[in-house]
Amino acid sequence: PSWVGEPRQDLLERLRSKEQFDTPLECPFITHWLHNMSHDQVLDMLKYMGMSNSKDSKVKVMFIPCYMDGNDGILDVTYYDLVLGNDLTVYPSYYEPWGYTPLESVAFHVPAITTDLAGFGLWVNSLKGGYSELKDGVKVIHRSDYNYSEVADAIKDTVAEFSALKDTEIKKIRKNAADIAEKALWKHFIKYYYEAYDIALRNAQKRLLSK
């Protein structure tokens, strides 16, 4: 989340009116005003990239800068409800020991894009015996300190690939995504916690006996 100020009253008024509008609001990306509108890195990048959310824009951006707890004042839906409304999610992790967001996505049968700098991405690769692809339900992209542009291109290509798929292909990918999520249930992972606690307790006992 960013340094959120308050919900946009001009946006709220339009939503409540139920009317159709053909003129954009000021700063037509963001749902809530920020305390630092002129210094927010996301907004700065959108402006730098020439994003406008105009009628002719092929890409429309909706920047929700707050926690999705169901009480944000504009959408008033939870994060999980929002995930369900997606066809594909993108979490291009730079570093996450595990990374729950792509796992949560596939648990809702929504395919995800992540990287091998997330533990989840590495784990999915281990399931597949190599880099997981979009058809598997999770696309894992190689990311390092030096390949930002390559990662951006890979994300772009994957989104374009997904958008060209037939409904039958998407259904299969969604099923594969859910199958991956099933393998991450606690009933499968809990044994590793038992093993870790066992090792820790044995080592603690050795230290006590050596005193």
Set out the residue ranges of the language-model regions:
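Catalytic cores of carbohydrate-active enzymes across secretory and cytosolic contexts
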Residues: 1-211
